[in-house]
């Protein structure tokens, strides 16, 4: 049996994206509390994601959302990483409030924010190990968050389009 590389790209991209999520899941978490959520988007959901990006871009005047929507459309799949908001009770003040109790609802706990960053770094590192170029997108993450692709109550969502081509979109 001969498998032409072009014929197996999609399956390979999905496999790599799944491995990226494993890396995100197993990345170190603050206080050992895991509130990170991850998923892979492909097929029709990619188009819905791109359309939402365009709508947000038009509504807010963010031209880069329109550019990024085209990148998402050209991708084979998109890995998503976000976090559930949960104050870690350190009273560290890193969020801008003296204690966790004083923190305004909706203001992210910085430990959660750092956890997302570390998970994203682990995910793109895994992609790089397979020779796949990636770029972390705030734009696609915000659209995914608005669509609820990681579930209710998940915020700080970022997206990592996965493409296997001679030139990344």
What are these regions (language model features)?
Residues 1-169:
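Acidic, surface-exposed loops and disordered segments
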